[in-house]
Amino acid sequence: MPPNLTGYYRFVSQKNLEDYLQALNVNMALRKIALLLKPDKEIDQRGNHMTVKTLSTFRNYVLEFEVGVEFEEDLRTVDGRKCQTIVTWEEEQLVCVQKGEVPNRGWRLWLEEEMLYQEVTARDAVCQCVFRKVK
């Protein structure tokens, strides 16, 4: 049975974000802003229905989906693209595959005690983010 990721998580650290944003062809000005942000995550998991919110002072992003059901994701607020997305469980990790213009794009989320780990990929770039559960 997959873990319940429901909760509010505060940003702790990130590694390799600029390379990831460059792989998405995000312009330098937006990359510099993104590097200053410390976004929080809010996750609501109700069975196979999930809402994952990325919250920051600059921009918020809300992703709502059914696990295992492919959908069109509008990433215009992130990098100006749309893609076909599917999110599934692999063991205890929530895994997202985003098919579109950018190869090898997606992310993974998993819990280790009170820490939420996120790994995002695009092309050959891999970025790791860590969040601490606060409620």
From Swiss-Prot:
<dbReference type="GO" id="GO:0016918">
    <property type="term" value="F:retinal binding"/>
</dbReference>
<keyword id="KW-0813">Transport</keyword>
<dbReference type="GO" id="GO:0005504">
    <property type="term" value="F:fatty acid binding"/>
</dbReference>
<comment type="function">
    <text>Intracellular transport of retinol.</text>
</comment>
<dbReference type="InterPro" id="IPR000566">
    <property type="entry name" value="Lipocln_cytosolic_FA-bd_dom"/>
</dbReference>
<dbReference type="GO" id="GO:0019841">
    <property type="term" value="F:retinol binding"/>
</dbReference>
<dbReference type="GO" id="GO:0005634">
    <property type="term" value="C:nucleus"/>
</dbReference>
<dbReference type="InterPro" id="IPR031259">
    <property type="entry name" value="ILBP"/>
</dbReference>
<comment type="similarity">
    <text>Belongs to the calycin superfamily. Fatty-acid binding protein (FABP) family.</text>
</comment>
<dbReference type="InterPro" id="IPR000463">
    <property type="entry name" value="Fatty_acid-bd"/>
</dbReference>
<dbReference type="InterPro" id="IPR012674">
    <property type="entry name" value="Calycin"/>
</dbReference>
<dbReference type="GO" id="GO:0005829">
    <property type="term" value="C:cytosol"/>
</dbReference>
<dbReference type="GO" id="GO:0015908">
    <property type="term" value="P:fatty acid transport"/>
</dbReference>
<dbReference type="Pfam" id="PF00061">
    <property type="entry name" value="Lipocalin"/>
</dbReference>
<keyword id="KW-0683">Retinol-binding</keyword>
<protein>
    <recommendedName>
        <fullName>Retinol-binding protein 5</fullName>
    </recommendedName>
</protein>
<keyword id="KW-0845">Vitamin A</keyword>
<keyword id="KW-0963">Cytoplasm</keyword>
